[in-house]
């Protein structure tokens, strides 16, 4: 049985156009499990405000939650500047946007690291303030604070990039393995190759579904933004500078994330880009509004048409298959 080497092509070649980016964040939650007998042997009105369901907060929320807020900003930034990939927490970023995204995440990482340094430097001060604020429950809190040296390694903000590829050749199956399983060499090899083929087919289906989903998602973002403008024009509302700015932003966003080449939508967006310049004012210019309405309608017509999505994604894979990995 001969393994079809073309089975790996779609998935491998997808990573000629971008990489997967992951953000991994670690933090100390600054809480401690509640001791049911020691902490909750109280009347409801006497439960101190540092106790929440099942846990005690060891610091005020403005200190405790700052790391989660920075983390969320990082994840939101990555989500907004990438295409969601069907692997947990993975985001596909086209090469043309990779440096921009990495630099943006690095700034957020630097903010996170700076907050960690400040927190650790002020750890004992924050602890003393918390104990003073809850003097009546000091005994319930004081033993909950670990030494600062034990918590500093819990904080991290990591930015990782990778591509996924599968081996072009089968790994040899040792005779020891064959004998151990009491199988003939031929049968073992056939079984292994069949499993590899099935896995490669699954990965290529994943690549196809991802590109199709990316195409649909980017088009839907364009539709949402342009439809807002179409509605304003239809309702005879003023098209503001903020509205025009949103059009320019979605056009740039589409251009930076469209690694697969959605040519027809790109062409219409370029027409719109030429029209919505910084110096155009639509407030009292009926002719300008009419032109804008025409191009907005043209973009919406093309972006809403999903009948060509299979053709767009199919052409992308035909194109990259002409180039060796």
List each model region and its residues.
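Short amphipathic alpha-helical coiled-coil/interface segments
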Residues: 105, 109-112, 116-119, 123, ...
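Charged, low-complexity surface segments at secondary-structure and domain boundaries
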Residues: 90-112, 191-201, 208-212, 232-233, ...
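Leu/Val/Ala/Ile-rich N-terminal alpha-helices, chiefly Sec-type signal peptides and the beginnings
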Residues: 1-156
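A contiguous, surface-oriented mixed alpha/beta subdomain in the mid-to-C-terminal portion of proteins
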Residues: 176-259, 265-268
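Acidic, low-complexity proline/glycine-rich segments
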Residues: 148-194
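C-terminal structured domains
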Residues: 236-325
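Generic alpha-helical secondary structure signal
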Residues: 103, 110, 186, 201, ...
């Amino acid at each position: 049985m001969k393994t079809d080497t073309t089975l790996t092509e779609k998935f491998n070649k997808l990573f000629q156009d971008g990489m997967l980016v992951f953000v991994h964040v670690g933090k100390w939650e600054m809480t401690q499990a509640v001791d049911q007998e020691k902490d909750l042997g109280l009347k409801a009105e006497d439960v101190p405000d540092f106790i929440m369901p099942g846990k005690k907060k060891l610091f005020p929320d403005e200190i405790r939650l700052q790391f989660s807020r920075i983390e969320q900003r990082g994840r939101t930034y990555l989500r907004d500047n990438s295409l969601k990939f069907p692997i947990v927490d993975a985001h596909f970023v086209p090469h043309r946007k990779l440096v921009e995204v990495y630099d943006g995440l690095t700034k957020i990482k630097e903010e996170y690291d700076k907050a960690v340094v400040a927190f650790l430097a002020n750890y004992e001060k924050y602890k003393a303030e918390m104990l003073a604020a809850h003097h009546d429950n000091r005994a319930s809190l004081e033993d909950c604070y670990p030494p600062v040296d034990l918590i500093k390694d819990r904080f991290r903000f990591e930015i990782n990039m990778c591509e996924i590829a599968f081996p072009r050749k089968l790994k040899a199956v040792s005779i020891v393995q064959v004998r151990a399983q009491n199988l003939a060499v031929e049968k073992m090899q056939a079984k292994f190759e069949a499993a590899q083929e099935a896995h490669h087919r699954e990965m290529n289906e994943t690549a196809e579904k991802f590109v199709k989903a990316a195409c649909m998602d980017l088009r839907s973002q364009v539709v949402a933004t342009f439809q807002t403008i179409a509605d304003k024009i239809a309702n005879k509302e003023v098209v503001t500078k903020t509205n025009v700015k949103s059009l320019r932003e979605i056009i740039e966003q589409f251009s930076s994330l469209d690694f697969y080449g959605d040519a027809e939508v790109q062409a219409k967006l370029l027409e719109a880009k030429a029209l919505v310049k910084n110096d155009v004012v639509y407030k009292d210019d009926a002719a300008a509004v009419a032109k804008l309405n025409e191009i907005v309608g043209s973009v919406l017509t093309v972006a809403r048409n999903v009948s060509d999505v299979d053709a767009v994604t199919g052409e992308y894979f035909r194109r990259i298959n002409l180039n060796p990995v």
